[in-house]
Amino acid sequence: MGLLAFLKTQFVLHPLVGFVFVVSGLVINFVQLCTLALWPVSKQLYRRLNCRLAYSLWSQLVMLLEWWSCTECTLFTDQATVERFGKEHAVIILNHNFEIDFLCGWTMCERFGVLGSSKVLAKKELLYVPLIGWTWYFLEIVFCKRKWEEDRDTVVEGLRRLSDYPEYMWFLLYCEGTRFTETKHRVSMEVAAAKGLPVLKYHLLPRTKGFTTAVKCLRGTVAAVYDVTLNFRGNKNPSLLGILYGKKYEADMCVRRFPLEDIPLDEKEAAQWLHKLYQEKDALQEIYNQKGMFPGEQFKPARRPWTLLNFLSWATILLSPLFSFVLGVFASGSPLLILTFLGFVGAASFGVRRLIGVTEIEKGSSYGNQEFKKKE
């Protein structure tokens, strides 16, 4: 093990990484709050500024994947599809099996220049998660309670608001509604059998309302749907904590592009199209498990230096005064001051750990265990 690899495993560095992310995030959120004054004057200027502010925060997480853990991401697709990346609005459909699936998605967004403007249909609880939810609020992210009767008007209004977005955006949909677990899968397949739908081996039954509504509201804005099927080599089950400890993973993503005009206008037909898509995704996962790769040409988009430079800039600005302060605390010789400082460090580490816990499968939402039994 090299020195750098050894240092990545040391707990003492992790609070420093967390400190940079949290404090820079609070600064960014404050600046975002100030930009609200621009909305009545120039909505598009407000949006462009917030895309760049969000990039400065999200790219720190992408940096952990790309530069800290050196995780590699390989695309399986075709040249024509790759040439369109970052040059059109798109809806992204991604399987929700892994703790860092969102991070792999963000990595691709970063490499094709749409990280700051990326969107997601997110559960309402995330709005109240510090930094993440607050940043999303200023980005006009569409939040839902996952109760369609209550969500319909909110989701439609939020999607239509994005029709004049000034920068290319990728709108992420987790059509399964919740992260895959064996328990949720069993309940989901019971519902599939009751509805006469084919059983899926690697996915939950997709929820069609969000997809059909997004496609309907974003017609004329979005050019295509990108279906992304993600898996990891070596049957690995990566985690954000693993990334923080410098573990390297190899992510493979099969990407298929569907022009939006190929998706039916009728809601029922669009729902059937989505169910068929998930049957195809299941077949792709079966191929991957048998052959260790997806079909299609392989592309490895080069990582860009901006995520690393952004983090190093924030680290230089924030850690220099922190180190001076720490030296002053210990130089004072005051037991009370030292204990207070150590208590603060412990509380901060706990807070960062709670943020990481948002991504953990075993601590994920119970949504889906029983909700699959209800009609959409």
Swiss-Prot record:
Q: List the ranges whose topology is Lumenal.
A: 146-316
Chemical reaction(s) catalysed: a 1-acyl-sn-glycero-3-phosphate + an acyl-CoA = a 1,2-diacyl-sn-glycero-3-phosphate + CoA; pentadecanoyl-CoA + 1-(9Z-octadecenoyl)-sn-glycero-3-phosphate = 1-(9Z)-octadecenoyl-2-pentadecanoyl-sn-glycero-3-phosphate + CoA; heptadecanoyl-CoA + 1-(9Z-octadecenoyl)-sn-glycero-3-phosphate = 1-(9Z)-octadecenoyl-2-heptadecanoyl-sn-glycero-3-phosphate + CoA; 1-(9Z-octadecenoyl)-sn-glycero-3-phosphate + octadecanoyl-CoA = 1-(9Z-octadecenoyl)-2-octadecanoyl-sn-glycero-3-phosphate + CoA
Recorded GO CC terms: endoplasmic reticulum membrane; nuclear envelope
Set out the biological process GO terms recorded for this chain's protein.
CDP-diacylglycerol biosynthetic process
Cytoplasmic compartment ranges equal 1-124, 340-376
For membrane topology, the record states: Multi-pass membrane protein
E.C. numbers? 2.3.1.51
Location in or out of the cell: Endoplasmic reticulum membrane; Nucleus envelope
State the UniProt keywords alphabetically.
Answer: Acyltransferase, Endoplasmic reticulum, Lipid biosynthesis, Lipid metabolism, Membrane, Nucleus, Phospholipid biosynthesis, Phospholipid metabolism, Transferase, Transmembrane, Transmembrane helix
**Residue interval(s) of motif HXXXXD motif:** 96-101
What family name appears in the similarity comment?
Answer: Belongs to the 1-acyl-sn-glycerol-3-phosphate acyltransferase family.
PANTHER family (UniProt xref): 1-ACYL-SN-GLYCEROL-3-PHOSPHATE ACYLTRANSFERASE GAMMA, 1-ACYLGLYCEROL-3-PHOSPHATE ACYLTRANSFERASE-RELATED
Q: What is this protein called?
A: 1-acyl-sn-glycerol-3-phosphate acyltransferase gamma
